[in-house]
Amino acid sequence: VKKQKGTDISLDEAQKMYDVKTDIFHSMPTAEIFPGVKEIMQKIKNAGMQVGVVTGSGQRPLIMRLLNDFGEYLDEAHIVTAYDVKRGKPNPDPYLMGLQKAGNLKPWEGIVVENAPLGVRAGVAANIFTVAINSGPLPDTELSDKGSNLLYHQMTEFCKEFEALIVTAKQTAAENTPNV
């Protein structure tokens, strides 16, 4: 609030704002799953990779929805919420925590898939290969200018190219790994 309105608010005022936001969130109709999301999760699983979700939310109903909708690909141990980090997106902390929860992976061992500018910035700041999915009304530059490595307009487009990207990534890694 200080940044946006130039004024401080009390903890009580902040809690009231949060409660109103939560009430609005819960009164909204349930959003449909974007086409291609379950397919990309299956492809990630088939590639021997771990699916994780990084969200700026800490809303328990959202976490339960994720587990309900994507439980065959995801478990709660691999969800990063606002409560897991001190600094949220666009800072790298949420994605670095995601790497930690996935088994202490290095940034080059992960892939960020994001549809929001702050998330793209966070993935890039964490030095993780970042794919932007511009599934909304933003100009492409709102995502590409934040540093995304690739940009698609639908998850289904990314899904179609996923296996080829993984093959290329593995070949590149093998070519750049020094022989010991």
Give the residues covered by each predicted segment.
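Short, mixed-charge, low-aromatic patches
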Residues: 1, 17-23, 50-58, 117-118
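A metal-dependent, Asp-based hydrolase signature
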Residues: 1-25, 35, 43
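Generic secondary-structure transition motif, activating predominantly at the C-termini of alpha-helices
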Residues: 5, 22-25, 29, 45, ...
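Short glycine/serine/threonine/alanine-rich loop segments
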Residues: 7, 49, 128
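Asp-based, Mg2+/Mn2+-dependent phosphohydrolase catalytic module
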Residues: 12, 38, 42, 58-180
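Short, acidic loop-to-helix structural element flanking the phosphoryl-transfer center
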Residues: 26-53
